[in-house]
A protein has these predicted regions:
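A structural signal for short, hydrophobic/glycine-enriched beta-strand patches
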Residues: 2-137
């Protein structure tokens, strides 16, 4: 399998994208426990660290399972780069690993989500497969 190499973006552009991602993942509403707890949180593989953190935080705080979907696909290298740049997560080895495997390691090591609360789908190679394979999990 070959990975698509995208053109490099300037650091200023990447910083702006990460700022928008952090804002979108922000949860600044007063906490009111939901009347009905969700059955699980679904996290599709991606390289936006704030959205990864938000999904892990929600699963951890509510004590519910986290389904993580993502194999190795066209944007996996972006996740590898984001992890390498992250001040805490950069100790995780990423090369050759599926996105879901990396994100599950983050969930366990940094968010203390127990292994029995993690469902890992690591075969999908794109967003459509993330959804289809997650539904089957």
């Amino acid at each position: 399998m070959s990975l698509t190499i995208f053109p490099s973006l300037p650091d200023k552009t990447l910083a702006a994208v990460n700022t928008v991602g952090a804002w979108l993942a922000e949860d600044n509403l007063p906490y009111n426990p939901p009347a009905l707890l969700p059955d699980l949180v679904v996290l599709a593989g991606n390289a936006v660290i704030p959205s990864i953190d938000a999904a892990c935080r929600l699963a951890s705080e509510l004590g519910i399972p986290l389904l993580i979907s993502g194999g190795i696909g066209h944007s996996t290298t972006f996740l590898y780069a984001a992890i390498a740049r992250h001040p805490r997560y950069n100790r995780i080895r990423t090369t050759g690993k599926a996105e879901a495997t990396i994100l599950a390691e983050i969930a366990r090591a940094f968010w203390q989500i127990p292994p029995e609360h993690l469902l890992v789908e690591d075969q999908s190679t794109n967003c459509g497969e993330n959804a289809r394979f997650s539904a089957a999990a």
